[in-house]
Design a protein with these regions (language model features):
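Compositionally biased terminal segments of proteins
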Residues: 1-276
Length: 276
């Protein structure tokens, strides 16, 4: 759940992409260009300031076979994990064949590798479709909307819903957690607080899954993740409630004991001695 990897930050992302383009040019030559469309956390890092890191770069890669070797060489050079840049997300629910169409230009490196990212509404649509409680999906949604509002370019609910339909169709099955956030985020006037509480909830969910993995190795699966999180949250809330009740009962017991103690009603003289 928590990868033992060096994080990819806003500061080093462009450095890695620049080195990747150089390596690709060396292996591939200059005749066949390549295109990489940044998805997910990498797209957030490239375009926004509220998030500091990701652990891998999800992307759509349109390139010759030399790109695979270039990715591995750059990973070795910088001590990055195998697959630090990959297209594995194509196997997830948030993938759509239309993502290339809705991508926007970011940068070109070494005159051969063009980097693109996903336009804001469609990046939000992907995050809503993914809706993982234990990752950054939900807080990324709030963060993106928050930054667009601060910049004077707010994104409407209608534009996000149109983007979801455009990528996934009218009958798209959006996760329950995403639907709940969709209603809350566009009615909230306080994105800062909503971002903080959403991120705290994600970190708690991640912690609960790690705890479950330690207690029940090899039983965590995609289909039971949400129920495990909900069960863990319920137990924690009940534990907090029981702890609070226990403290109140103890306080009440001490107060009652004090009231019943004769010594509590006895006065003292000026030297601090009880009168006889």
């Amino acid at each position: 759940m928590s990868p033992d990897k060096e994080p990819i930050t806003r500061d080093n992302l462009n450095e890695y992409l620049k080195d990747l383009a150089k390596e690709f040019r060396k292996l591939n030559g200059t005749k066949t260009p390549a295109e990489i469309i940044l998805i997910g956390g990498a797209a957030v890092l490239a375009n926004y300031g509220f998030r500091d890191l990701t652990y891998d770069v999800d992307a759509i890669i349109v390139a010759s076979s030399a790109m695979k070797d270039a990715i591995n060489h750059v990973g070795d050079k910088h001590g990055l994990p195998h697959g630090w840049l990959n297209a594995d997300f194509k196997r997830t629910a948030s993938y759509s064949d239309r993502l290339i169409e809705v991508s926007v230009y970011y940068r070109t490196f070494s005159n051969i590798v063009t980097i693109r990212t996903v336009a804001a509404e469609y990046l939000l649509a992907m995050k809503f479709m993914s809706g993982r409680q234990y990752k950054n999906d939900l807080s990324d949604i709030v963060g993106i909307l928050w930054e667009h509002r601060k910049s004077g370019k707010p994104i409407s609910r209608e534009s996000v819903e149109k983007a979801i339909e455009s990528l996934y169709g009218k009958d798209a099955e959006i996760p329950v957690t995403s639907m709940q956030l969709l209603g809350a985020v566009f009615s909230s006037g306080d994105y800062e607080t909503l971002y903080r509480t959403t991120r705290e909830s994600e970190l708690e969910s991640k912690e609960l899954l790690l705890e479950f993995e330690r207690n029940y190795p090899s039983t965590l699966k995609g289909e039971n993740i949400n129920s495990i999180i909900q069960s863990g949250q319920l137990k924690r809330r009940e534990g907090q409630k029981d702890s609070m009740l226990a403290k109140l009962e103890e306080k009440k017991r001490i107060v009652e004991k004090t009231k019943q103690s004769p010594d509590a009603l006895v006065g003292h003289d000026k030297d601090g001695r009880k009168p006889r």
